[in-house]
Amino acid sequence: MIIATIGSHSALQILHGAKKEGFQTMVITDNKRENFYKNFSFIDNIYAYASLDEAVSIINGIKDYGILIPHGSLVEYLGKERVDKIETKIFGNKKIFEWEADQKKKMELLRKSNIKIPEIFERPEDVDRLVIVKLNGAKGGKGYFLARNKSEVKEGIQKLIESKMIRDENEVIIQEYVVGVPMYFQFFYSDIINRTEIFGIDIRYETNIDGLRRLPFEYMKELKINPTFVVVGNIPAVARESLLPVALEYANNFVRTTKELVPPGMIGPFCLESIITDNSDIVVFEFSGRIVAGTNLYVNGSPYSWLYWDEPMSIGRRIAREIRVANEKDKLSLVVS
């Protein structure tokens, strides 16, 4: 069996973990990155593509003996139509992709999981406080903007339309901006052992908002630079232990809801992207239904994964172990779609 993934996002971690669990590994990459991946001995096969259609053909070439591990770049790069043409087994529940690509469906899933979320405004006219306007899909924060009132919301949406990032206002979600500190809680759900594991926590390092924070207030006021939220890196974090029971409760609620609304439900890694308020409330503003790039911080294991496994366990390796154990128990169908 060969473990494959697209060359981006968390590919190195995924393939490193797969090799640790005894699998052959394969990266399918843009030909501009081929030389980069040649630097890593744990990657057994490197296939470079010149077009996205060729990428799909390469993936389908291993359908009889391979498993594709999805990450944030899969749908964002290939597009939904091409992903639908993939015949190779995909780790996880690919029905989640559709929910993850739509901000409004995302929030519906969180709400039905009895998870505390920010208020959502259906129309710009309803805005009565500071909001953040977000685009659909895994765009790493690109195009997001803050607005204080309905006029600023309308103005920002119009700029997105003019730049062709969206077609109309239905392609954004207007969300209350919750003041607090960000914490992105990473989890792994195993149907094989019926357990939700809290894996790690990260904070996104975003430009230019994190750079603006270093400026004195009077400079920021004078420069009049609008903050942007493009993710360029990740910072590790450990939460107060008193926060963890609520975070894990939210994760278990989320798993149960996905089983009801998106059967067979959540499989493998996911992330509840949250703000912690000064009342220690965890407010979840988004989820990712697959491996997140913040797990790249923990290639040698996280403070939490050590508590479960007592050995180095990245999410990449955890995925590979789930596949290996499922295959050994003749339950591979439970972890792929």
UniProtKB/Swiss-Prot annotation:
Annotated residues for binding of Mg(2+): 273, 286
PROSITE patterns according to UniProt: ATP_GRASP (PS50975)
Cofactor binding note: Binds 1 Mg(2+) or Mn(2+) ion per subunit.
GO biological process: 'de novo' IMP biosynthetic process
Cofactors (names): Mg(2+); Mn(2+)
GO MF annotation list: ATP binding; ligase activity, forming carbon-nitrogen bonds; magnesium ion binding
Pfam family, one: DUF1297
Pathway of action: Purine metabolism; IMP biosynthesis via de novo pathway; 5-formamido-1-(5-phospho-D-ribosyl)imidazole-4-carboxamide from 5-amino-1-(5-phospho-D-ribosyl)imidazole-4-carboxamide (formate route): step 1/1
Reaction(s) catalysed by this chain's protein: 5-amino-1-(5-phospho-beta-D-ribosyl)imidazole-4-carboxamide + formate + ATP = 5-formamido-1-(5-phospho-D-ribosyl)imidazole-4-carboxamide + ADP + phosphate
Enzyme class: ligase
Protein keywords: ATP-binding, Ligase, Magnesium, Manganese, Metal-binding, Nucleotide-binding, Purine biosynthesis
EC number: 6.3.4.23
Top-level taxon of origin: Archaea
Residues given in the record as ATP binding sites: 124-184, 206
Record-listed 5-amino-1-(5-phospho-beta-D-ribosyl)imidazole-4-carboxamide binding positions: 9, 73, 234
Domain ATP-grasp residues, every copy: 94-324
Family: Belongs to the phosphohexose mutase family.
Role, per record: Catalyzes the ATP- and formate-dependent formylation of 5-aminoimidazole-4-carboxamide-1-beta-d-ribofuranosyl 5'-monophosphate (AICAR) to 5-formaminoimidazole-4-carboxamide-1-beta-d-ribofuranosyl 5'-monophosphate (FAICAR) in the absence of folates.
Name of the protein in its database record: 5-formaminoimidazole-4-carboxamide-1-(beta)-D-ribofuranosyl 5'-monophosphate synthetase
Lineage: Archaea, Thermoproteota, Thermoprotei, Sulfolobales, Sulfolobaceae
